[in-house]
UniProtKB/Swiss-Prot annotation:
Belongs to the GreA/GreB family. GO terms for biological process: DNA-templated transcription elongation; regulation of DNA-templated transcription elongation. Residues 53-73 form a coiled coil. This is Transcription elongation factor GreA. Necessary for efficient RNA polymerase transcription elongation past template-encoded arresting sites. The arresting sites in DNA have the property of trapping a certain fraction of elongating RNA polymerases that pass through, resulting in locked ternary complexes. Cleavage of the nascent transcript by cleavage factors such as GreA or GreB allows the resumption of elongation from the new 3'terminus. GreA releases sequences of 2 to 3 nucleotides. It comes from Pseudomonas putida (strain ATCC 47054 / DSM 6125 / CFBP 8728 / NCIMB 11950 / KT2440).
């Protein structure tokens, strides 16, 4: 059985590590204390504070395990250490110009967990990312989106 490794940027790995640290060093002890205090209140069957703390503890522990799994099954790619060739690869930041409207957009190609279109971070599996990965500055690509077909020119590829 082979385990699939998932690409992740340095920033994405750092964010998960920080969340893991917060959950394990701050939230876990806080919830343990809250459960202990709720136990002291007596009958656990009808103790809402106890049940709420236990439920939250379960969610925190599940998230900690999820983060640990994601970090174990990731390949962290530092795009700043890769020679700049003008080619779009995982981790690069790409400036695209809509050939019809000349409107420019900037996206960084990131892992699935890091994607946030509002912050300009596209999952490597997104239609636009799939269309531009492997292409170079000056290339034109046609992207099929839910709202129709859009043609972009790759204006600039940055390793930042």
């Amino acid at each position: 059985m082979s385990i699939t490794k998932y690409p992740m940027t340095v920033q994405g790995a750092r964010a998960l590590e920080e969340e893991h640290l917060f959950l394990s060093k701050t939230e876990r002890p806080r919830l343990s204390q809250a459960i202990g205090e709720a136990r002291e209140l007596g009958d656990l069957k009808e103790n809402a504070e106890y049940h709420a703390a236990r439920e939250e503890q379960g969610m925190v522990e599940a998230r900690i395990r999820d983060i640990e799994g994601r970090l174990q099954n990731s390949v962290v790619i530092d795009v700043t250490t890769i020679p700049h060739t003008g080619k779009v690869i995982f981790g690069t930041t790409v400036v695209l110009a809509n050939t019809e409207t000349d409107e420019e957009v900037t996206y960084q190609i990131v892992g699935e967990d890091e994607a946030d279109v509002k912050q300009g971070k596209l999952s490597s599996g997104a239609p636009i990312a799939r269309a531009i990965i492997g292409k170079e500055e000056g290339d034109t690509v046609v992207v099929k989106t839910p709202s129709g077909t859009v043609e972009y020119e790759i204006v600039e590829v940055k390793h930042i």
